[in-house]
Amino acid sequence: MLLPLACLHGRVAQCLTSLLLLAEPLPRPRRGARARGAASTGAEAAPAAPPAKMAAELYAPASAAAADLANSNAGAAVGRKAGPRSPPSAPAPAPPPPAPAPPTLGNNHQESPGWRCCRPTLRERNALMFNNELMADVHFVVGPPGATRTVPAHKYVLAVGSSVFYAMFYGDLAEVKSEIHIPDVEPAAFLILLKYMYSDEIDLEADTVLATLYAAKKYIVPALAKACVNFLETSLEAKNACVLLSQSRLFEEPELTQRCWEVIDAQAEMALRSEGFCEIDRQTLEIIVTREALNTKEAVVFEAVLNWAEAECKRQGLPITPRNKRHVLGRALYLVRIPTMTLEEFANGAAQSDILTLEETHSIFLWYTATNKPRLDFPLTKRKGLAPQRCHRFQSSAYRSNQWRYRGRCDSIQFAVDRRVFIAGLGLYGSSSGKAEYSVKIELKRLGVVLAQNLTKFMSDGSSNTFPVWFEHPVQVEQDTFYTASAVLDGSELSYFGQEGMTEVQCGKVAFQFQCSSDSTNGTGVQGGQIPELIFYA
């Protein structure tokens, strides 16, 4: 699968670089520590170095000096035995000092003779050889023309860690050249690959992780590839999910593909309106647009498709016209379920977009209004979307004794999950004395930071049922971290309340854990109170 990887890797990886830099990355080392290791990770944009010298050349001056000294001593001894010493000749002029070594990329430096003593373990000594000219027997010229870097390496180390390198150096068709060109791998990614092979250290960054995954796949280093996938999963969110979906398909990573679909389905509107959506390839576009589980309105899908078409026209150097948009979209336009929009959505959106022909627009209007509906080339059935799930944390509810009162105070509870979910809203109790309208503010926080909130109203019918209050968009919640759900209600003072609360609740494949929140000032806790339900997608 190397050919399709190389074809699409460049453009999509460039887009994801900017998107991942916006997401929260894994903890980074301090800048000072980074600076010390920048050369070995390829982070510096060092100027192209002249052809690297082998170890024998590096040590030649010292060896020559030692030989001269030995010869002069031997000559002096012979002279003393043979007879009277001849007058000393004029001293030879001192040789000019050697020119300073040009800057190189990485760990290219001479080590003191005792470097082995300072590194007692095999791992430490082996790590020292990473990107080091000492004993290097092969050099790689990495990167595209005009942006190459020369990297020294040791065939044995690479062959032990990669079957591809083994075949390259020791197989039947082994390379005999001492310099090997690799134009399709980024220098920084190649250095990360080699650093892992020399030292087992994995140093991933948001701006190089995709290129590193490509290199790990190319040279069949599965542990590094797995680390890259794990890094991408932790960085996965709505704004980069579509790009990562495209990459996961190219790299044949089914687990990452599934994680991408979970985000895209649950947060479809945010994913489709992201900049990353406009950078995917057309095949991925078609796969997304045909997705049955997209949890958004069809008008949002249509708008996203038009945005992608405009971006594709720019990439191909075409004028942005309705004709060219139809051309770059191809069959993708006819995968949008336009007839499932409301008549108002169609009239104010797709009908005025100019991308549909007059005949198509006329036929769709007739389909909305006429008894005898015309045949359309667009799908007619609504998407199924996602069915929300509810985690109910109380075993019973009450209202007669110890009446619960909403007094504009905060009811709050903390929760954690054992896998990623998307909180869509909260289920709340209503009035215990008949129909009533409530004003409510719901909020979701993590470590004191507000992730989502909504100020709205809901009607209760006097029953003990819970009433859903939704966030504007589902909120991504990660595993093994406590979040705080809060609600502040104003309205009828008397309401139902929950009893016999549970600290742990299993909802399908998701386990919820609850604990009291210090934000709660109206009496809600684990054992009783309000916020009986969390509404989520998984």
UniProtKB/Swiss-Prot annotation:
It comes from the Eukaryota. Residues 29-53, 76-115 are annotated as: Disordered. InterPro entries: BACK (IPR011705), BTB/POZ_dom (IPR000210), BTB_POZ_BTBD6 (IPR049738), PHR (IPR012983), PHR_sf (IPR038648), SKP1/BTB/POZ_sf (IPR011333). Residues 85-103 have a biased composition (Pro residues). GO terms for cellular component: cytosol. Expressed in lens. Residues 1-17 form the signal peptide. Residues 136-206 form the BTB domain. Keywords: Cytoplasm, Signal. Coiled coil: none annotated. It is found in: Cytoplasm. SUPFAM superfamilies: POZ domain. Its main location: cytoplasm. GO terms for biological process: neurogenesis. Residues 35-53 have a biased composition (Low complexity). Adapter protein for the cul3 E3 ubiquitin-protein ligase complex. Involved in late neuronal development and muscle formation. This is BTB/POZ domain-containing protein 6. It comes from Homo sapiens.
